[in-house]
């Protein structure tokens, strides 16, 4: 924002007039603000996207190590696209279950935030290490010791409840990674090295 790079945000308030007031105060030519009264949808979307961005990041780490590096770097994107599709589907189910609106997931708080996190976030970086075969605790100690990884912490906290309430496979898979190798998890879930079966 300091450099006036174009970006957008979403303001959630049950009182839509209040949201409009805030929108008028902070919107600029380069800072666009959308508004919604779907507070739970925005809150849940922005939180759980961290879990999914971690799992999508694992796609790069899980690329077939026997393939040439240039092939790994190019084609894990197809794997990521498949995981993004599955992630958004689960996010819709999750958000609607807890009182949010599906359209919120397809907006800035869901799909938009997920995209940013996957492209350059801390959670996707942790996912890459998990995909390479590191356990979470080892990757945290070796590479991200002083960095907060919200997706991992949230997955550990809500994983069991999600399994009970929704059977959301990707969240549960991510939660299991805490004590197991990602490649082992992939095999248990009948997923091959590039998640093609997803």
Positions of PLM-derived features:
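Conserved beta-strand termini and adjacent loop/short-helix elements that scaffold enzyme active sites
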Residues: 36-38, 108, 173-175
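Short, flexible turn/loop "capping" segments at secondary-structure junctions
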Residues: 1-4, 108
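Small-residue-rich helix-loop
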Residues: 77-115, 119-120, 132-146
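Short amphipathic alpha-helical surface patches that mediate protein-protein
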Residues: 27, 110, 174-178
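Internal alpha-helical scaffold of NAD(P)-dependent oxidoreductase catalytic cores
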Residues: 5-104
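Short glycine-biased active-site loop of nucleotidyltransferases that positions the nucleotide triphosphate
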Residues: 1-2, 45, 118
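Predominant activation on well-ordered alpha-helical scaffold segments within soluble catalytic domains
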Residues: 20-24, 52-56, 85-92, 96, ...
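C-terminal active-site/capping subdomain that shapes the small-molecule cofactor and substrate pocket
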Residues: 120-198
